[in-house]
């Protein structure tokens, strides 16, 4: 009838093309169309994992640097502490030695006074004198081995770190502020002052001949305290 739709013409070429394409090829093409989306998911996961590892590595590196800095600081502090402890022990040991030797020095002074003042008479007295002088020499030798050395002060400029001035007196021989006499010997211990030397210090030239007798008498009185003291013996240490 004239109202019916036209029937498509039969195309033998199209039928042959459809028949020549296998069903497996069609299925393969359909699967290839969905494969890119399936591969992109693992790649994105790997990138995220890599970024996470990089962040962890950076964090661990910072932590390592922090710990290393702390270790170096602790090691330096410990080294300083060890050195300070060693110095403190040396100072304490030296202080103990100084304290002990300070108690022995008066004995040395007594030996020197006896050697200077005593004049033994007779063989027995001389034998006794030689006996205690032998003890004195042994004591001096021990002090030398410990590093003790006596000061030489007469004629030296007055130094308050080495000398203790007992009096000042005019002197025609020595200029002002020069040690004129040693009243008690001073000692060093390995370069450190063990005992200050008691000394008299020059005031420079004394009064001229025109000075009044009262002035001269006053100067004599200023040193009268030491006139009766024995002169120190020759250095023994």
From Swiss-Prot:
PROSITE patterns linked to this entry: GRPE
Alphabetic keyword roster: Chaperone, Cytoplasm, Stress response
Transmembrane is among the record's keywords: no
Protein name: Protein GrpE
Organism expressing this protein natively: Prochlorococcus marinus (strain MIT 9303)
Compositional bias of kind Low complexity: 204-218
Function, in words: Participates actively in the response to hyperosmotic and heat shock by preventing the aggregation of stress-denatured proteins, in association with DnaK and GrpE. It is the nucleotide exchange factor for DnaK and may function as a thermosensor. Unfolded proteins bind initially to DnaJ; upon interaction with the DnaJ-bound protein, DnaK hydrolyzes its bound ATP, resulting in the formation of a stable complex. GrpE releases ADP from DnaK; ATP binding to DnaK triggers the release of the substrate protein, thus completing the reaction cycle.
Polar residues: bias regions: 27-40
Assembly notes: Homodimer.
Cellular localisation: Cytoplasm
Gene: grpE
Residues in coiled coil: none
Residue segments, region Disordered: 1-52, 200-237
InterPro entries attached to this UniProt entry: GrpE, GrpE_coiled_coil, GrpE_head
Main localization (coarse): cytoplasm
Family membership: Belongs to the GrpE family.
Source species, domain of life: Bacteria
Molecular function as annotated in GO: adenyl-nucleotide exchange factor activity; protein homodimerization activity; protein-folding chaperone binding; unfolded protein binding
GO cellular component terms, A-Z: cytoplasm
Disulfide bond annotation, renumbered to this chain: none
Pfam family, one: GrpE
GO biological process: protein folding
């Amino acid at each position: 009838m004239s109202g019916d739709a036209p029937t498509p013409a039969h195309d033998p070429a199209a039928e042959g093309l459809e028949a020549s394409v296998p069903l497996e090829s069609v299925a393969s093409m359909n699967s290839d169309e969905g494969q890119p989306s399936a591969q992109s998911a693992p790649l994105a996961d790997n990138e995220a994992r890599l970024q996470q590892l990089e962040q962890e590595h950076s964090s661990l590196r910072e932590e390592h640097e922090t710990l290393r800095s702390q270790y170096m600081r602790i090691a330096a502090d410990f080294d300083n502490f060890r050195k300070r402890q060693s110095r403190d022990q040396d100072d304490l040991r030296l202080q103990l030695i100084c304290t002990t030797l300070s108690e022995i020095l008066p004995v040395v002074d007594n030996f020197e006074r006896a050697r200077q003042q005593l004049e033994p008479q007779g063989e027995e007295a001389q034998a006794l004198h030689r006996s205690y002088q032998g003890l004195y020499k042994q004591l001096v030798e021990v002090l030398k081995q410990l590093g003790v050395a006596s000061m030489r002060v007469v004629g030296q400029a007055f130094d308050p770190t080495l000398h203790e001035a007992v009096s000042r007196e005019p002197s025609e021989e020595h200029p002002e502020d020069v040690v004129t006499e040693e009243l008690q010997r001073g000692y060093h211990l390995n370069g450190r002052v063990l005992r200050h030397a008691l000394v008299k210090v020059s005031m420079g030239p004394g009064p001229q001949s025109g000075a009044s007798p009262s002035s001269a008498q006053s100067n004599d009185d200023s040193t009268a305290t030491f006139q009766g003291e024995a002169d120190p013996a020759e250095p023994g240490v």
